Amino acid sequence: MAEIELHDEIEAWLDSLSQDDWERIVVIIDRLAALGSTARMPFSRSLGEGVFELRFTLGRTARRVTYRFTKDGRIILLTTFRKQRDNERHEVARAKRAADACAVDYP
């Protein structure tokens, strides 16, 4: 099982969730930890440049959590966003910037 680490944005988002949503996300994150790099669609999708997204819904809202792998196999959860067609390109670019920024702390 892969070790999961949380970027500041993910920590803040998790703290803002209701108990029910938090418990649901923990199950999703645990599944990612168990699957590691073998996670595939529809659960996970590559965004390119070593960044991936978890795909899930909370209530009736499609959400994404972006992540990357470190050289030693840890998974760093980077950003989160509500899935909308209009914002995907911007959110993918933001996730890639977060991955680049945290590569110093999590090589």
Roles of regions detected by a PLM:
Residues 1-62, 71-75, 81-107:
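Basic, Lys/Arg-enriched alpha-helical interface segments
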